[in-house]
Amino acid sequence: MTNLAYHLPTFIPAWRIVTEKRDRDGDFALPASLMRRMVCVKLQTIMWKQEFLMATMLDVSLRAGVSKATVSRVLNGTGQVKESTRQQVFTAMEELGYRPNFLARSLANQTSNSIGLVVSTFDGFYFGRLLQQASRQTETHGKQLIVTDGHDAPEQEEQAVQMLADRKCDAIVLYTRYMSEKTIMKLINSVQTPLVIINREVSQAADRCVFFEQQDAAFKAVDYLISQGHREIACMTVPIHTPTGKARLMGYRKALEKHGIRLDERRIKYGDAGMTRGYELCRELIAEKVPFTALFACNDDMALGASKALHQAGLKIPQDISLFGFDDAPSAKWLEPALSSVYLPIDNMIVTAIDQAIRLAKNQPVEAIPPFTGTLVLRDSVTTGPYFNQKSSSASSS
């Protein structure tokens, strides 16, 4: 009987279609359009077979000896279920080959049991670390992570957020480099899905933001160089039209200002965060004969490019030029000499953001999260400068 039920639907629909399509001479006509219809029927039949043979939640409950409601609680992670009962349910699921239909459940509940993540780009170690930790943290909450990128364009970042909202993500985490604060607030207020912003401070949505003190971290790096006797300090920026780029440059300026060092605009080179640009900008500094004893690169990739330019010019690190990076990339400790840099706790930031997003999704109360701070990682690329034995306040600015 089971075999008959399995095979019967394969033939009956096709027979009906063919008998309805006899030509005038009584012969069967099978034009291309009909063949397409028969293929569709065949596909529908295969789906029917799978559904006919697929184990259901009721089957699991009968095999485990528990109610269907208990199986549902185990699958959804809701309610109180004894561990022994949970194991019974999981054993029954494995024996029956049961797979929950998450798509059907999401349509019924208007959720997807997933967290969306929008990043500016997939390039670089920074985003690799962020994605890895985001995936792990999402899994600890029993949810899936859906990731998309904004192609370094605010319009596409906005579209990505809307796409994830349309997919009924429980919450969305947005890492944006370029989106304006006005657009961020528009999304927070218009998108029904809870939205958490990382690496950006939005004053009107303090409980939705998880960010670094970028300016303070850059200030610490340049302040350290000054404390080591450097006053002629050059700076290579990351894109200045981004909040991160502006904040790191401001940290550089504030450190000089604190020590009464006059800002020399010739020592500031505006970059794009890449190794090639770091190499080119450092060559410009050398070619223009701008005097400097230390170089602050606003990310480690640019510092790496600068190190090659210095080497080609016959300048030694740190004997001739001290070099300080930012982000503490994995490559920093493998440079020769090892690169001093600023470490930002990316892992802690994304874990906090995921947790905050899930609290919002559950309509739990949330509070503003204090900003994360950077830590100086001191290695071998910095040595004392010409003013090391003098007080900063008494040294003449260059």
Predicted segments — roles?
Residues 5, 9-11, 16, 20-21, ...:
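N-terminal helix-turn-helix DNA-binding module of bacterial transcription factors
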Residues 13, 283-398:
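Flexible loop/turn connectors
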Residues 52-56, 94-132, 140-141, 151-152, ...:
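N-terminal helix-turn-helix/winged-helix DNA-binding helices
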Residues 88, 126-140, 217-221, 243-262, ...:
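Short, solvent-exposed amphipathic alpha-helices that sit
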Residues 136-181:
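Central regulatory/effector-binding core of bacterial HTH transcription factors
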Residues 152, 174-220, 261, 301, ...:
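Flexible loop/hinge segments that line or gate small-molecule binding clefts
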Residues 210-235, 250, 254, 275-284, ...:
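Hydrophobic alpha-helical segments within soluble ligand-binding/sensing domains
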Residues 219-261, 266, 369-382:
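An alpha-beta-alpha
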